[in-house]
Amino acid sequence: MDDWKSRLVIKSMLPHFAMVGNRQEPRKLQESGKKPSWMEEEDLSFLYKSSPGRKHQGTVKRRQEEDHFQFPDMADGGYPNKIKRPCLEDVTLAMGPGAHPSTACAELQVPPLTINPSPAAMGVAGQSLLLENNPMNGNIMGSPFVVPQTTEVGLKGPTVPYYEKINSVPAVDQELQELLEELTKIQDPSPNELDLEKILGTKPEEPLVLDHPQATLSTTPKPSVQMSHLESLASSKEFASSCSQVTGMSLQIPSSSTGISYSIPSTSKQIVSPSSSMAQSKSQVQAMLPVALPPLPVPQWHHAHQLKALAASKQGSATKQQGPTPSWSGLPPPGLSPPYRPVPSPHPPPLPLPPPPPPFSPQSLMVSCMSSNTLSGSTLRGSPNALLSSMTSSSNAALGPAMPYAPEKLPSPALTQQPQFGPQSSILANLMSSTIKTPQGHLMSALPASNPGPSPPYRPEKLSSPGLPQQSFTPQCSLIRSLTPTSNLLSQQQQQQQQQQQANVIFKPISSNSSKTLSMIMQQGMASSSPGATEPFTFGNTKPLSHFVSEPGPQKMPSMPTTSRQPSLLHYLQQPTPTQASSATASSTATATLQLQQQQQQQQQQPDHSSFLLQQMMQQPQRFQRSVASDSMPALPRQGCCHLFAWTSAASSVKPQHQHGNSFTSRQDPQPGDVSPSNITHVDKACKLGEARHPQVSLGRQPPSCQALGSESFLPGSSFAHELARVTSSYSTSEAAPWGSWDPKAWRQVPAPLLPSCDATARGTEIRSYGNDP
């Protein structure tokens, strides 16, 4: 019974500290289905309870309480009363695991180690997961409880000293001390662990320290995460097998969280809240665990597992919750994602890494950052979309919303964020910079960025620019978000955007040159750019688009007559956009113009035909530009290059035109003959070179114009984009309110095809020609 007494003392102590108001936890643990695994041991516990051993337990508990009062006073003065119960229950449990007295002792002793050496403790914590798995496997059901309790005690600063005292208590046998020593030795990171840490590229101390601080901070999230890990481990019996070896160490992990002090019980208890995230954790952690498992020196496995789990959770959980939080996963977002140990970010809901949009909303920025690092590799590996995603990720990192698309977002959070912040705050700057940085994601980034929430379907694209729009411009965000629904098209247009990447790269100078204009455009440039675009849309919201399919020129002609509309748009949008239009129009005009066109089209059809031409260019820039180039706008088929060029030239000319009042029109019309001819020439060349792409771009773009025109479903990809546009429309409408009726739909649809590679070349030329106009 001495062994039992010592165990009871330790266990009762652990519950006292760990219970911290969770005295019912042991019962919960038992009730939570631990009994089945404890049946045998529980039977023993009952025997012990009925046997004089229980008296010993009471005595030991009293002794413990005496000691406990000292420590509990430090942790929680009220524990002594509550502790008795947990102690009894724990003692019962301990008696249950009486078969493993040494294990229980070791576990009890281990927690101090966990508390003292964060790296070693972390290693033990990782092993505690294994230990918990063992309880799950039924290897040491009693021990798991003991371990969780110990963990909880470890969480409490006083508990460690209390453990030490317990160790010094005569009830604690030397056996326990020996086990403790062994555990301590095990805890020391082994060369293998260090190697694993190096390989993982994460400092074991950091994760360990993070985990430990979480435990010290009584980070419930970490316990949840740990529970997830434990569950993952439990699910992965490989770890469970190796766990048995690490039984003593497993105690430390529970120390992370008080509530989770009962690894198994807490598992069921925590599972309630982190069950979903645990499921994710399991899949993620399990996936990672196999990796960490190979080097399974108990301590090493812990480090490897923890690092791996953290890495996996970082990628998965971090992307879901907080990419940046992974390091502190438990600390920064403890409450948000308790389930996720690696990244207990505020989004436990996003169990699936990419799918859950909720995660991005809370603190996707950090997640994006972290995720971008961890996920960027996988996301980028995935496809160009991954690249786009990277951009999106970066923007998402900056933007909480993009979170759902953590994988894609994460890849380029830095890029997108930098573009947002770097080039211009303006949407165009964001679009341009993100697109430029991630050429394929220029419009794509901008579009997806705009609807972090709506664009979940297009995670990669959305991810690319969600952050950008948010940062850059709320209205633009609405447009972008509205465009994001266009992400549907964007998915189709993504390729186009990839082509556009080149154009974006070329276009970047414009945005840089017109960074001021871009900023203004972001504020007003959207309106300014869209005035031209809006004009065409206004001209024939629905018909022009479909008409553009066959005869963009004719519509353009009417739109030119509607030049008067441009003023309306400008008035509506605050004409300041002339200068901004040049830079912003290129990137933002396509998107903003479409929406503005839609809104303004509805609002006004007075703006100058130049604006209308610009919009038409946006709608059918390729055709129209080509027509201008070939002097037969109607004959020219809408082509991405021409369209893009027209749009780009319109954008670059927008400033001059808005200044001249006819920049876009002159592009298409002789008014700004020099600009128009050169632009058309470039566009024509680019269109001719990339004529095949032009249709795509024009299609991608037309959907926006179609939407702006009211025939969103006109284009092939438009129906879905139209739906998205509607959804986003409502979503963007609120955000796009500043722009009035601006139809985000048009925005969404426009961007993707706006910048085909040919268009990029033409646009680049155009930009070079007019990039300095602003």
Curated annotation (Swiss-Prot):
Record keywords, A-Z: Activator, Nucleus, Phosphoprotein, Transcription, Transcription regulation
InterPro entries associated with the record: MAMLD1
Tissues where this protein is expressed: Expressed in fetal brain, fetal ovary and fetal testis. Expressed in adult brain, ovary, skin, testis, uterus. Highly expressed in skeletal muscle.
GO cellular component: centrosome; Golgi apparatus; nuclear body; nucleoplasm
Family membership: Belongs to the mastermind family.
Cross-referenced PANTHER family: CG1 PROTEIN/F18 (PTHR15275), MASTERMIND-LIKE DOMAIN-CONTAINING PROTEIN 1 (PTHR15275:SF1)
Clinical condition linked: Hypospadias 2, X-linked: A common malformation in which the urethra opens on the ventral side of the penis, due to developmental arrest of urethral fusion. The opening can be located glandular, penile, or even more posterior in the scrotum or perineum. Hypospadias is a feature of several syndromic disorders, including the androgen insensitivity syndrome and Opitz syndrome.
Name of the protein: Mastermind-like domain-containing protein 1
Originating species: Homo sapiens (Human)
